[in-house]
A protein has these predicted regions:
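Short coil-to-beta strand junction motifs in C2/discoidin
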Residues: 1-5
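Beta-strand elements of well-folded, non-transmembrane domains
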Residues: 7-13
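Long, ordered, helix-rich scaffold segments
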Residues: 10, 44-398, 402
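Surface-exposed loop/edge segments in extracytoplasmic proteins
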Residues: 13-21
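Short intrinsically disordered coil segments
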Residues: 20-26, 57-58
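Short proline/glycine- and polar residue-rich coil/turn motifs
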Residues: 23-39
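Positively charged, low-complexity/disordered segments
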Residues: 403-407
Length: 407
């Protein structure tokens, strides 16, 4: 197999070094071609120990393992001329920090910061040559789901959420002025336009707003409320509402009420309203979702509405679905059983939210297994739901004989 790797050598000043092979060969467009089991490339005129920036622009669709040090990653995050590797360096640093802070929080310790990561993000925000859409992507920390996959086992969703929220707040505090200035600069004047440049500016503006509000500062919550009220397009209004949705209080409640009143006659937008309320991480979410199942606009006979509310709760809210008391599991299991007779495809899709239960910490793992077993042992299940439950409960280490109850 031939693997083309676009490669660069970064000096300690963050600038690209010239690529000159010691054997006199040329490196066209920075591409090193791997065509053997092992390839060796020796460069000349290398003035100092470089940082290797490899697989730039994701030139080869491969999983790459490297031994880049944290300090080298910080340099790449701040200076690499290749956007993909710059983004990858930020993601790796942030992921490492989050995984470490999850462990610290679970041990009762304070989370740590990575000053080099914060400085790199500051440099990215200050770099006017970068596309706003790219900067917006870089500023978003790895998701809770990504962090859980990185941890792999004994996962505590609450600790992951606290670590991620803490990092977002830290970015918002440390880069407050830069984020505030960028927010102002990214406002798109004039009539709304869906072109790529305007869309990128809106994306960056809304990420800045979200990070600023993550600090919990009242004037930043007020800024989100102001954007919600003054928005002239759905992208900005939804972004402001999603930001407010993360912060309990009068501002969130007022915006949620207003949003429903504005758009109650548009089914697709009402789905978004249900979606947001099911995704908020505060402890009252399950009670709110239960109440919303009685709302005049909700019906178990409307699959889109069920997906928007119960589906989002199950698959898009890892802290509240995976509540330590197991109430989230029971709520979803109950609705799977209620919906299965009339819509087995929808019910099985909801049940698939349990697929990662074995990766959870022991308490949640036991409660999730109990809810799954209750579903599986219910008589007259549809084939769809029975299959999902069976596959979730049986693995290579466990014989399925105890599960072969009559249905």
């Amino acid at each position: 197999m031939v693997i083309p790797l676009v490669t660069g050598l970064l000096g300690r000043d963050g600038q690209d070094m010239p690529l000159r092979l010691a054997d006199g060969g040329t490196v066209e467009r920075g591409v090193l071609v791997l065509d053997k089991q092992a390839n060796t490339f020796t460069f000349k005129d290398v003035r100092e120990q470089p940082v290797l920036s490899i697989n730039r622009s994701f030139s080869a669709p491969i999983k790459l393992t490297t031994n880049v040090s944290p300090d080298d990653l910080r340099l790449m995050a701040a200076h690499d001329s290749d956007p993909f590797n710059r983004w990858q360096a930020v993601q790796t640093l942030a992921s490492t920090l989050l995984v470490g802070n999850v462990a610290r929080l679970r041990a009762g310790q304070d989370p740590e910061a990575d000053e080099g990561l914060l400085e790199a993000l500051d440099a990215i925000l200050a770099d006017s040559s970068l596309e706003p859409a790219f900067v917006a992507e870089v500023l978003v920390p790895p998701s809770e789901a990504d962090t859980a996959r990185e941890i792999g086992r004994d996962v505590d969703p609450d600790a992951i959420y606290r670590a991620r929220m803490g990092l977002r707040a830290l970015i918002g505090l440390h880069l407050n002025k830069r984020l505030t200035d960028t927010y102002g600069r990214m406002v798109t004047p004039g009539v709304y336009s869906p072109d790529a440049d305007s869309a990128g500016r809106r994306a960056l503006k809304n990420v800045c707003l979200d990070l600023l509000a993550a600090t919990g500062e009242p004037h930043m919550i007020a800024l989100a409320s102001k954007q919600y009220q003054s928005a002239d397009n759905m992208t900005d209004r939804m972004a402001a509402l999603a930001t407010l949705n993360q912060h309990e209080g009068a501002a969130r409640d007022a915006a949620m009420d207003d949003f429903y009143k504005r758009y109650q006659d548009d089914p697709l937008i009402v789905d978004k309203w249900f979606n947001l309320q099911a995704s908020t991480r505060d402890p009252g979410t399950l009670d709110r979702v239960r109440a919303l199942t009685k709302h005049a606009a909700f019906s178990l006979g409307n699959p889109n509405r069920v997906r928007a509310l119960i589906g989002m709760f199950a698959q898009g809210n890892p802290t509240q679905f995976n509540r330590a008391d197991g109430a989230g599991y029971d709520f979803v299991a109950d609705h799977v059983l209620t919906i299965d007779p009339s819509n087995p495809q929808l019910a099985s899709r909801m049940l698939s939210a349990f697929k990662s239960w074995r990766a959870l910490e022991p308490g949640r793992r036991a409660r999730a297994e109990s809810a799954l077993s209750r579903v599986y042992e219910t008589p007259n299940l549809s084939r769809d739901v029975q299959d999902i439950a069976h596959r979730a409960l049986v693995d290579s280490d466990r014989k399925s004989t105890r599960l072969n109850s009559s249905h």
